[in-house]
Amino acid sequence: MNLMLITFNEFKTGISLNDTRAEHLVKILKLKDNDKFKFGILGEKNIYHCIYKKDKKLFFKKIFKVGESNKLKKLYVLIGMIRPIVAKRIIKELASIGTYKIIFFNTELTEKSYLNSKIFKNNDCEKHLIAGAMQGKITYLPKIKIIKNLKESLKYIQQENFEIKILLEKNSEKNLIDIEQINNAVIIVGPERGFTEKEKQLIAQYNFSPYSISTNTLRTETATIAASIITASKLINM
């Protein structure tokens, strides 16, 4: 945890010492009285130092400003529905990168029961977003959207006018690392069993271009994170 993230209400009232964030300060970082740690408030740009004091709760005070959070990058990532345990890891990593929006959708080869997982139905994903944002020292969280199928997902992002639309495709002759600097981008990644040819044709109709990041067959998790890091590195900071 490189940055403790709290809500505005937690800033006013403090958090329990049993909270995993408070426990991390003591058990992992080994903080003692009068040691400093960094915190930020969700949705606010400033990052502050705070003095740790053992008390009935962990209270926060803005001792002095030490910096500002990076903004989210104008990067959308569309992912064919995957196993919930894999989705959790992807959500955390994309939050640490500073992705703007993550969209999950069903495909022809998706296991449809995944959509009923609590991570997608009960807003369980927020804790994974926060964990990723704390790792990336970002005070902003990506938005997550669940869409019922591929076509609706493509329609949803059509109005955004992306400068580049990337379909991850192992056999493409174009390598993602070679793209120019851009202001915004969208990536679409197939589920663990990939897209059907019919789905690839539909994606092409929405002006996505195939790019490769490796000639090897990668797991969806690996491909999504690697492609997002590469693309994010090409985005011009706004």
Curated annotation (Swiss-Prot):
<dbReference type="InterPro" id="IPR046886">
    <property type="entry name" value="RsmE_MTase_dom"/>
</dbReference>
<dbReference type="Pfam" id="PF04452">
    <property type="entry name" value="Methyltrans_RNA"/>
</dbReference>
<dbReference type="GO" id="GO:0070042">
    <property type="term" value="F:rRNA (uridine-N3-)-methyltransferase activity"/>
</dbReference>
<dbReference type="GO" id="GO:0005737">
    <property type="term" value="C:cytoplasm"/>
</dbReference>
<keyword id="KW-0489">Methyltransferase</keyword>
<keyword id="KW-0698">rRNA processing</keyword>
<protein>
    <recommendedName>
        <fullName>Ribosomal RNA small subunit methyltransferase E 1</fullName>
        <ecNumber>2.1.1.193</ecNumber>
    </recommendedName>
</protein>
<comment type="similarity">
    <text>Belongs to the RNA methyltransferase RsmE family.</text>
</comment>
<dbReference type="InterPro" id="IPR029026">
    <property type="entry name" value="tRNA_m1G_MTases_N"/>
</dbReference>
<keyword id="KW-0808">Transferase</keyword>
<comment type="function">
    <text>Specifically methylates the N3 position of the uracil ring of uridine 1498 (m3U1498) in 16S rRNA. Acts on the fully assembled 30S ribosomal subunit.</text>
</comment>
<keyword id="KW-0949">S-adenosyl-L-methionine</keyword>
<dbReference type="InterPro" id="IPR029028">
    <property type="entry name" value="Alpha/beta_knot_MTases"/>
</dbReference>
<dbReference type="InterPro" id="IPR006700">
    <property type="entry name" value="RsmE"/>
</dbReference>
<dbReference type="GO" id="GO:0070475">
    <property type="term" value="P:rRNA base methylation"/>
</dbReference>
<keyword id="KW-0963">Cytoplasm</keyword>
<dbReference type="InterPro" id="IPR046887">
    <property type="entry name" value="RsmE_PUA-like"/>
</dbReference>
<dbReference type="Pfam" id="PF20260">
    <property type="entry name" value="PUA_4"/>
</dbReference>
